[in-house]
């Protein structure tokens, strides 16, 4: 018996719509990452992009448990000495709620060429409106 390896050309990728309102950030991000990779499919192949496109709405209404709004910190660096910038989750969500969810999902994807390709299939919007109506995304509850 031979092992079947899925091919990218034979994949049927769908568009999925996810409402992030009152969803816990980490749990939602792990389910989105699973969909992006295609791990929900029986023909999952680790090195092939078989996952769906995911459109997330209401990213500004995502929830964090405990005191993570103030205790969870996001770091970035300008490249200069002493150029480290630190933001709490509350401040990041107030300024750019899409980035909060995108960083959570990015942390759960592989850090290679495939991961960079997968993160491009994630579309995050802070309101209930999105410009992907032409793709007719299927609304699912994760």
Curated annotation (Swiss-Prot):
Biological processes, Gene Ontology terms: negative regulation of translation; translation
InterPro entries this protein is in?
Ribosomal_uL13, Ribosomal_uL13_bac-type, Ribosomal_uL13_sf
- Which Pfam family is one of those matched by this entry? Ribosomal_L13
Its Gene Ontology cellular component terms are: ribonucleoprotein complex; ribosome
Q: Which domain of life is it from?
A: Bacteria
Note the CDD domains from the entry. Answer: Ribosomal_L13
KW Magnesium (keyword) present: no
Q: Name one GO molecular function term.
A: structural constituent of ribosome
Q: Which residues form the signal peptide?
A: none
Instruction: For this UniProt record, give its keywords in alphabetical order, as a comma-separated list.
Output: Ribonucleoprotein, Ribosomal protein
PANTHER family in UniProt: LARGE RIBOSOMAL SUBUNIT PROTEIN UL13M, RIBOSOMAL PROTEIN L13
Task: Spell out the subunit comment.
Answer: Part of the 50S ribosomal subunit.
The record's family statement is: Belongs to the universal ribosomal protein uL13 family.
According to its UniProt entry, what is the function of this protein?
A: This protein is one of the early assembly proteins of the 50S ribosomal subunit, although it is not seen to bind rRNA by itself. It is important during the early stages of 50S assembly.
Q: What is the protein named? A: Large ribosomal subunit protein uL13
Q: Which organism is it from?
A: Syntrophobacter fumaroxidans (strain DSM 10017 / MPOB)
**Which lineage ranks, top first, belong to the organism behind this chain?**
Bacteria, Pseudomonadati, Thermodesulfobacteriota, Syntrophobacteria, Syntrophobacterales
The protein's gene is named: rplM
């Amino acid at each position: 018996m031979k092992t079947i390896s899925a091919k990218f050309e034979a994949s049927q990728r769908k568009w999925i719509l996810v409402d992030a309102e009152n969803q816990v950030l980490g749990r939602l991000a792990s389910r989105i990452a699973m969909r992006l990779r295609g791990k929900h499919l029986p023909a999952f192949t680790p090195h092939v992009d078989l996952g769906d496109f995911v459109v997330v709405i209401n990213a500004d209404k995502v929830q964090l448990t405990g005191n993570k709004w103030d205790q969870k910190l996001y770091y970035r660096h300008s490249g200069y000495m002493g150029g480290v910038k630190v933001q709490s989750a509350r401040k990041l969500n107030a300024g750019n709620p899409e980035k909060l969810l995108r960083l959570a999902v990015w942390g759960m994807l592989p850090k290679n060429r495939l991961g960079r390709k997968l993160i491009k299939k994630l579309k995050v919007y802070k309101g209930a409106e999105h410009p992907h109506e032409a793709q007719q995304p299927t609304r699912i509850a994760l």
